[in-house]
Amino acid sequence: FYGVAEREGDESLVRTGCIPAGSASAEAADAIEQAVLGFEDAMHRFEFHRALGVCDAFLRGANKRWSDASKAAKAAGTEDPARGDDLMTQALVDAFAELRVATVLMHGVVPRGCELICEYFDIAPEAFFSWDHVLETTDEFVRALGEEPGSHRVKVLPPRFDFFAY
């Protein structure tokens, strides 16, 4: 959420307050699919420990992808701001896709924190937590909400906000 937050004086093209349009990278899309299928399989078998393990591995991988991609974007942006914006846009597309799916997967375990994430996505919970949309790309999901990709605004997140500290 902080990555797209509008900042006065920041000329970055990614700071629109909206989830950026675009397709998740092949690595992120594959991780999403594997996590959803693995989680679904584990839950079907009532292997809750395995389902949580799938989520843990997915979240750790998503965090590493975000860390690596955002650092690369910042480094590239010092020499070529347009290239930095392109890389940051892709990092954000991946991060929002992975966060949405992780939130759906973890909703049964930590409902309050996940519902707070949904609130800051500014999407109705009925749509956000629907398994009908879990494997859709973010662009497909935003279109299903009746909006154009790249135009869905998220709520402004307060500084140092923790969704799970309650």
How does the language model describe each region?
Residues 1-87:
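Long, charged, mostly alpha-helical binding arms that flank functional sites
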Residues 46, 56-166:
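Basic, alpha-helical terminal appendages of large translation-related enzymes
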